[in-house]
Structures are given as C-alpha cells and as structure tokens.
Amino acid sequence: MRKSLLALSLLAATSAPVLAADYSDGDIHKNDYKWMQFNLMGAFNELPGFPDGSNHDYLEMEFGGRSGIFDLYGYVDVFNLASDPGSDKSGKEKIFMKFAPRMSLDAVTGKDLSFGPVQELYVSTLMEWGGASEVNSQKIGLGSDVMVPWLGKIGLNLYGTYDSNKKDWNGYQISTNWFKPFYFFENGSFISYQGYIDWQFGMKDEYSSSSYGGAMFNGIYWHSDRFAVGYGLKGYKNIYGIKEVNGVDSTGFGHYIAVTYKF
C-alpha cells in the first residue's frame, strides 16, 4: 500500500506525463491504494493562544487512500500523552479528529471530466471534531486534483462550512495540499516538501471576531520506506476567525517536529 503512494510521488517528482482519471472502462478500483502511519509530534507556539501559543506533544494516527469512487484523508490526534498536569493541554480536550472523504465525479459518471490542468473532480467533504466546546464543523463543496508546475498534482477544494456548535452555516473554506519529493538518495530515501493551506472567509460577525483567517504549513521531511523525520513551519492569520487582540494570540508562526513510523 505504501509502495503505491511512493510510486505516485516518484512519478510526479520525475515530471512524467500524468494522465487524467479515466473510468470509462468501468474499472473504478484500478487506482486503489491505502496507507497509514503514526507520527510522534512536538508543537511549539501552536495557535490560537489565550494569551500565548501552546507548546505540547501529541501522537497522530494519519491515514488515506483510494477505494473505487472514494478518496480519503484523515487523522486522529491524541494530546498530552503522559497526562502531565503541567502540560499546556492539561484539562483540555484529549482528542482531535479530521476526516476528509471525497467522491469522484469522474468515477461516478464513468466520464472523463478533466479540463486544462484539472485532472479529476470530486464532491468534497471535511469533518472536524475537537470535543464539547472546541472546533466542531462539517464542510461540503467541490474538489479537484490539479497539476501545477514543479509541485505536480495537488488537491484543491472549496467548501461551505456548517458550524455544529452554532447550528448554522458560517462562511467558506478553500484548501489545498501537496507532497513533492525533490531530492533522492542512493538508498531510495528522499527529501520532500509537503504541506497545505486552509483559508476561511465570509464568516459571520455574530460568530467570529474576524471574517477571515487560516494557516499554511510548510514541511521539509526525510522519508524512507518505513520511517520519516521532519520539521514544519506553520503560519497563522486570524486562525479559526479569531482576531488578534490583547490576550489573544491568533497570528504568527508555530513550529512542529515529527518522527514517523509507516505501516
């Protein structure tokens, strides 16, 4: 399963021609693959902070793949692993979960819906659960796989956001993600540039102190077949629609380190 993902990454990295999804032959499972890994993470100055950013550790189970008409990415984070009373996460929600299933319109219709750099179209969803009073939202919209210079294939999705805590729709989000191997070693391991952008806009004044906000993660990781080690710089701007004011830190930079084991 992991080899399938690696093969796709290597294909993009070598700039080989990438064909649009074609399911006209009826075989919707020909592009199936799956992967899973555990990441031991350290976060430094993670935002938002009240009043300062958080420094803490957590374990992340991360997974994804493709099965027929469905494309999936997700993770489950478990915070404060040792239940340290001195941790910034002590007394707070223990788990955060994110699931992002997409349904391929190309596979559903059996037609090639590609155009220009757009390789495949999806109905995209995104579900985030952070506990009783934390971020709890569901998003739905239009998604795509797009070919861009150097990076290769990226995911690009536009959602409308439903806030489960408020029981109301609240703005929109545009998201993109990428994975680009760019340096290869003789033993088959490689270094990648990987990351994502999540940008919210059009949020209502009654629910958010800022109508816009988001984050960008830029990671440099070393990968082998079984392990990965990396550093990520995450930039925040009014994250979650929280405006930067006295006593609230929602704009700035956070730092992340990760040690990964792949299954």
Curated annotation (Swiss-Prot):
InterPro entries: Channel_Tsx-like, Channel_Tsx-like_sf
Signal peptide stretch: 1-20
Gene Ontology cellular-component annotations: cell outer membrane
Principal subcellular localisation of the protein: membrane
UniProt-annotated location(s): Cell outer membrane
Keyword match Repeat: no
A Pfam family recorded for this sequence: Channel_Tsx
Keywords in alphabetical order: Cell outer membrane, Membrane, Signal
Membership in a protein family: Belongs to the nucleoside-specific channel-forming outer membrane porin (Tsx) (TC 1.B.10) family.
Function as written in the Swiss-Prot or TrEMBL entry: Serves as receptor for a broad-host-range vibriophage, KVP40.
Name recorded for this polypeptide: Outer membrane protein OmpK
Organism: Vibrio parahaemolyticus
